[in-house]
Amino acid sequence: MASSFEPSLSTSGMRPPLTSADAPSMADSLPSINFGFEDLRNRMAQFTARFDAFIEKGRKQILEERNQFKIGLAELQEDQRMKQRDIEILNLKSQTHDQTIQKEAAEAAEMHGTIASVTMERDSRLAKRDRLKQQINETQKAINQKLEAQKAHARHLDAQARLNIPELEFWQDYLCLRIEGAGREDRLKFIFSHLLEKDWEAEAWFELGTSSRDYDVFHTRPKVDRDALNGELDILNEDRDFGAFLKRMRRLLVEKMQQKRPTI
């Protein structure tokens, strides 16, 4: 480093007195000044080099930081894009999950409805089965009662038949009557002869139904008025006097035959 200029060093007190012969010239009497330009130039060059190095280093640092910022920004953008994609995927999954839940809820509701319908149908069938069982039991009971009544009636008819055989034979002889089948188990055909004095071969008959307790007449020859038949049947079903009924039927048939034959 160059030494600075010090005026105190140029004072005369610092030098010995000079003679006139030895006195320096005016130029020689001027102080010797060393500004240190070379050192200053070197120092400026060093400063410039250091400054340029600092600037270059700063520029490189700025470029590196900018590159790092760009890289970080790109990474952040990529991360944001990935997160956005993840969000979209999650939203899609959430929508799918909601749709699945709604579908399962609808299926569950439909299943509950089906179960309720099946339960109602089962209960209805069980109630119907119970009613049918009750009806079957009641029908069976009625059938049993009817069978017992028919058996009792059959026993009664059998006993009555045994008692009435002599009486029936009497009426057959007395009324010129014979009994035949009418083509059905529950019908009998009663045929009368010797009805007309002028035509002993002429016959008349009627079919009697015996399927129930009350008797009924289905056919007659000659044809007898229905009102007259119903009157005779009412008497028979009330008093159960079969012999008297046969006599009345013979009389009705004779009257009908006499009405049809011309008088001479």
From Swiss-Prot:
Keywords: Cell cycle, Cell division, Centromere, Chromosome, Coiled coil, Kinetochore, Mitosis, Nucleus. One of its GO terms (biological process) is chromosome segregation. Transmembrane segments: none annotated. Residues 1-13 have a biased composition (Polar residues). GO terms for cellular component: Ndc80 complex; nucleus. Pfam families: Spindle_Spc25 (PF08234). It comes from the Eukaryota. Component of the NDC80 complex, which consists of ndc80, nuf2, spc24 and spc25. Acts as a component of the essential kinetochore-associated NDC80 complex, which is required for chromosome segregation and spindle checkpoint activity. Belongs to the SPC25 family. This is Probable kinetochore protein spc25.
